[in-house]
Amino acid sequence: MSSDPNFSLISFLECLNEIEHEFLRDKGENYPVLVRKLRELQQKIPNDIANLPRDPETIQQIHQTTHRIRAVAQAFIRFDQKFVSLCSEVVHGTSKVMQEFNVVSPDVGCRNLSEDLPAYHMRKHFLLTLDNPYPTQEEKETLVRLTNESTARVGQSSVNRPPLEVHQLTLWFINARRRSGWSHILKKFAREDRSRMKHLVRAKLSSSNQSTPPSSTSDSLSNNLDDVLSDNLGRPLTPVDKQQFEDDWASMISWIKYGVKEKVGDWVYDLCAASKKTPKPGMPRPVTTVAKRHPARKTKPAAKPKSRTANPRASTTPSIDSTLDSSKLESTPELSMCSTADTSFSTFGSSLSMSHYNPFQDGNDILQSPTVKARGNRKVKALPKRAGKQQPDEVDNGKIPFLCLSVAFV
């Protein structure tokens, strides 16, 4: 460093006073000139300044002058930072006011955010607060009101969509952070630290020449995207890391802008809507399960085997060997078909004497003839032989019991 041999503390104080007056008088246009003068003054200071003659009063004035220059410089730096922060707040506030009046701002318009989506206002708020997409309670209530008003105005209420509520909006933001990839970037490139994520998003927006959300504190960290990524990863940034971050960022922005509906096309939703049948009022909505997709083949239930035990029908028709007492009538399967034999058989019994009737007196004529003539010119059909009851007096006398014929009127 070259030094001036004629340098003294008095000349040094005079140079500082001149720089101080110019610094206070200038409006910012000559700041580079002042910086150049300070560098030249630094070069004139000899290395052996400690060996110069010391004047306590001059040294005190030099300290006071340098302190004033430092204070003014720091004040100007803070003013500049505050000015930038206020500009960002004005832009953000203007965008919020325009959002409430449903006016698309130029910044959002250039992002091609789809206004046809039901979650338009929520996605729009997500884009404006990428560094911290956690809306406050007041912002949630505003978004719910705007979404319900826009849905009713556009005519989407025709699909019987219920009004949005605050807890549903909270769940939407939770799912949006996860499904868009914001949480993935937070975990992979920001160490799951929301303050690091906020700085990373600001650096990315600055590198893309986009407006950054206002910051409540002065950010003294670097805004270089590569430096921020390298610091968050804890190692030097590689081209692969940079490409992965760019891909994840592009995927996140695409999901926030367009969602899923516009990617697959409206014809898919039209086809699904046409295939659905309108349920009857009052009927529960059918739920498709694995068992219902492939129903089992319907089979007829196994028929119960019929009982072979015949139920005997009580018949009031008396047999030929019974008495005329109706309380001792015999019920047989062969006589179940003779429903009109009561009157006819009583007439037949009155004309024939049971004690004198011998079915074998005419030989085999009665057996060979299928019918016999009864009283009143009615024909009766002979039924197969059946063993009759033996009379007690006949058994005692040694007589052979005779067979009775059951008859049925044709």
Curated annotation (Swiss-Prot):
DNA-binding region: 107-184
Database matches in SUPFAM superfamilies: Homeodomain-like
Keywords: DNA-binding, Homeobox, Nucleus
Residue span of region Disordered: 202-239, 278-335, 374-395
Sequence ranges of Low complexity compositional bias: 205-233
Biological processes annotated in GO: regulation of DNA-templated transcription
Species assigned in the record: Mycosarcoma maydis (Corn smut fungus)
GO terms under cellular component: nucleus
Entry GO MF terms: DNA binding
PROSITE patterns registered for this protein in UniProt: HOMEOBOX_2
Motif position, Nuclear localization signal: 276-308
Database matches in CDD domains: homeodomain
Function: The B locus has at least 25 alleles, and any combination of two different B alleles yields a multimeric regulatory protein, that activates genes responsible for the pathogenicity and for the sexual development of the fungus within the corn plant.
UniProt superkingdom: Eukaryota
Biased composition range(s): Basic residues: 291-307, 375-388
Gene3D superfamilies registered for this protein in UniProt: Homeodomain-like
Region (Variable domain between B alleles): 1-110
Main location: nucleus
InterPro entries (alphabetical): HD, Homeodomain-like_sf, KN_HD, Ustilago_mating
Family membership: Belongs to the TALE/M-ATYP homeobox family.
Localization in the cell: Nucleus
Highly conserved between B alleles: annotated span: 111-410
Chain positions covered by the region annotation Not essential for B1 function: 333-410
Protein name: Mating-type locus allele B1 protein
Biased composition (Polar residues): 312-335
Pfam families: Homeobox_KN, Ustilago_mating
